Design a protein with these regions (language model features):
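Catalytic-loop motifs flanking and including active-site residues across diverse enzymes
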Residues: 127-130, 310, 314, 410-414, ...
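Glycine-rich oxoanion-binding loops at beta->alpha junctions
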Residues: 68, 72-85, 275-290, 314-350, ...
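Generic C-terminus detector
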Residues: 231, 547, 562, 572-613
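Hydrophobic alpha-helical scaffolding
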Residues: 7-10, 101, 121, 125, ...
Length: 613
């Protein structure tokens, strides 16, 4: 949530900052601003409410702001309403200290009151202005430089932050600090960059540093020095980003979301190939030994949003194949309920960004109880990846659309791979079954590609027909219920249509009272053992007036006797059907949103990476 960029070098800063903020739009925002300084002059600050184009118009696409050092920000309101006044950057009255900030300062009211007693006044309702003036207070009181002032502020502040600060007395330099909020430092030839995520850096450099918690950085042109909170210089590893820069561009597609839907075959294939070697799944890079796998008594999967849905699917696969009890939890609940974690357990955290605040807190809670942790993440070097005991990297590449598609698909595959390998190591499946499952996994990329080729136009037509629906319900049983949850989320988050997913067996326990004439019900039935029971549930809603869309496996053509619109997925092992069943549901959500003329990639009120509670 929110986005920070920074630049110091020999080029004009403002156009680079604007371009960087554009690549962070997916994180969600309601206002934006820039601060740029030219040599020793005080920074010029320009802000705008609304979309980034308003800021671009104010600054003539950055050309009106002269200077080669600057910071920029897209704000998601947490303290103070969305307004130009509350937008970042924030500064002291004389602009001697200017800063942008992501995160939440929990004790900002207490600090604000003390600063008022010291003669400070405030023009905004934000916690960020409080941080700026606290830094200024320490800077002037102790007269010991920016690092000292920022370190003192860090010790005073409670909460989360990624801070980028410019001081009038230090031209062409930017100072940064971090606590539980993402910040990446890029280094090029004679220039340095700051960003909340990788995409803004890719056009300029692939050499980056990941700044850690309670650490500070000092950026010069092409040079960065890092310090701990005691202001002692520390060494950081320079990491090379392997992502393809073109992956963060639309590449001729109308939206990032449809591009990323079409990138799923490659993302799934790359993730499979990263661990399947010589006909076997190799988890040595994840650090999971066979002895650890054999000793497991329970697995906890903890995640948020779509990652949680991927975890629910993984639960079905792991329990059925490996016979290990699995509990799936929402991270926002897990972290606050004082969970009882058994010995010989494994806590698996799933997060695309590796920075999700609740998931990170859940990881730390598990570690504090001495339970081994594993991260399934898409971003190399992210906080969750760095802090987990074991790491399984998905290879989805940069995902820009707020509504996840390819990252979710790779999370599904990661869950399958763990389930299959755990079963193999523990001897709960035969060698023949292991080989069959591996073969089925490796067919998934081509099957997803075929689905995209065969069904896109039919689903586009159907989506246009139901673009004005008021309510849509998704139903399924077993692993199909996990797919139903993801399909419902995809629809509601980008089309703003009220949608819910229900376990089909629960319909008669209350939900069926919501079914009325013409309401759309999407039924997923890919499990042979549950097929007839699902048909019965579908007949129940149809006789109450529902319009039925059925999604099933090729060969189940008798479904057309019950449904009004049928979609078929290729045959695969039933443990892996979510990877195929979700694709038509992604397309449905996408085309409904397009038909309504909505902003598919940046739906209202949502952020790609939720880094605050």
């Amino acid at each position: 949530m929110c986005g920070i960029v920074g630049y110091t070098g020999d080029q004009q800063a403002a156009p680079i900052l604007l371009a960087g903020l554009e690549k962070l739009e997916y994180r969600g925002y309601d206002s934006a601003g820039l601060a740029v300084r030219d040599g020793e002059r005080v920074p010029e600050v320009v802000k705008a409410k609304g979309r980034l184009r308003a800021l671009a118009e104010k600054t003539d696409n950055g050309r009106a702001m002269r200077g080669n050092c600057g910071i920029g920000h897209t704000r998601w309101a947490t303290h103070g309403e969305p307004s130009e006044n509350n937008a970042h950057p924030h500064c002291t009255d004389d602009r001697s200290v200017v800063a942008v900030h992501n995160g939440i300062i929990e004790n900002y009211q207490e600090i604000r009151e003390k600063l008022i007693k010291n003669g400070y006044t405030f023009y905004s309702d934000t916690d960020t202005e409080v941080a700026v003036k606290l830094i200024d207070h320490y800077y002037k009181k102790y007269n010991d430089g920016p690092l000292d002032a920022m370190a003192r502020a860090m010790m005073r502040i409670r909460g989360t932050y990624a801070l980028a600060v410019m001081f009038k007395d230090y031209p062409e330099e930017i100072f940064v600090a971090r606590q539980d909020n993402p910040m990446i430092i890029g280094v090029g030839e004679g220039e340095s960059f700051i960003a909340s995520d990788v995409p803004p850096l890719l056009p300029y450099t692939r050499k980056v540093y990941y700044i850690g918690n309670q650490e500070l950085g000092r950026l010069h042109k092409g040079e960065v020095t890092f310090y701990n909170i005691d202001q002692e210089e520390i060494q950081k590893e320079l990491v090379t980003i392997e992502w393809d820069a073109e992956a963060a561009e639309k590449g001729g597609y109308e939206h990032f979301m449809i591009k990323e839907i079409h990138e799923q075959p490659r993302a799934v294939r790359d993730t499979l190939n990263s661990v399947i070697r010589d006909g076997h799944i190799d988890l040595t890079e994840a650090g999971l030994s066979d002895d650890v796998i054999r000793s497991l008594k329970r697995i906890y999967i903890v995640a948020c949003g779509s990652a949680y849905h991927a975890g629910v699917a993984a639960q079905y696969v792991i329990e059925d194949l490996a016979r290990i009890p699995v509990r799936v939890e929402l991270a926002s609940e897990f972290r606050y309920r004082n969970p009882i974690l058994e010995e010989n357990s494994l806590v698996i955290i799933i997060s695309q960004s590796g920075e999700t605040a609740d998931s990170l807190a859940a990881l730390r809670l598990a570690k504090s109880q001495g339970v081994p942790t594993m991260a399934i993440v898409n971003v190399v070097g992210s906080t969750i990846a760095r802090e987990a005991d074991h790491i399984f990297y998905t290879l989805a590449g940069p995902e820009i659309a707020v509504a996840t598609t390819k990252a979710y698909s790779t999370q599904l595959v990661a869950g399958y791979l763990l389930g299959v390998q755990f079963a193999h190591v523990r001897g709960t499946i035969t060698e023949e079954k292991y080989e069959e499952l591996l073969a089925a996994l490796q067919e998934l990329p081509d099957q997803i590609a075929k689905l995209l080729e065969d069904d896109k136009e039919r689903i586009q037509w159907f989506a246009a027909k139901y673009a004005n629906a008021k309510d849509v319900f998704f139903i399924g049983r077993g692993i199909d219920y996990a797919v139903s949850m993801e399909g419902s989320l995809k629809l509601k988050e980008i089309s703003y249509i009220h949608s819910e997913a229900y376990a089909a067996g629960e319909l008669k326990h209350g939900t069926i009272s919501l079914i009325e004439d013409g309401i759309l019900v999407v039924s997923i039935l890919t499990q042979e053992a549950l097929y007839e029971k699902m048909i019965s549930n579908m007949v129940e809603v149809k006789c109450r007036g529902a319009y039925l869309m059925g999604l099933t496996t090729a060969g189940n053509y008798n479904i057309e006797d019950t449904v009004d619109f049928a979609v078929y997925i290729p045959k695969t092992d039933e443990h892996f059907t979510p990877s195929l069943a979700v694709v038509p549901l992604q397309l449905l959500g996408y085309y409904v949103s397009v038909s309504k003329g909505l902003d598919v990639d940046k739906p209202r009120n949502l952020a790609k990476s939720v880094t605050v509670e």
